[in-house]
From Swiss-Prot:
The record marks Y30 as: Aromatic residue of the functional dyad. Coiled coil: none annotated. Blocks human voltage-gated potassium channel Kv1.2/KCNA2 (IC(50)=3.6 nM) and Kv1.3/KCNA3 (IC(50)=72 nM). Its main location: secreted. Expressed by the venom gland. InterPro entries: Scorpion_toxin-like_sf, Scorpion_toxinS_K_inh. It is found in: Secreted. The record marks K21 as: Basic residue of the functional dyad. Disulfide bonds join C3-C22, C8-C27, C12-C29. Negative results: does not block voltage-gated potassium channel Kv1.1/KCNA1, intermediate conductance calcium-activated potassium channel KCa3.1/KCNN4 or the Shaker IR (with inactivation domain removed). It comes from Centruroides tecomanus. This is Potassium channel toxin alpha-KTx 10.4.
Length: 33
């Protein structure tokens, strides 16, 4: 699957995380910026 930054970030925020980033084409959620 291709990680799209905007989608990843929005998905992470909806799950209560601070932000999301694409690492090795995978979405990673972070509790901090």
């Amino acid at each position: 699957a291709v990680c799209v930054y905007r989608t990843c970030d929005k998905d992470c925020k909806r799950r209560g995380y601070r932000s999301g980033k694409c690492i090795n084409n995978a979405c990673k959620c972070y509790p901090y910026a």
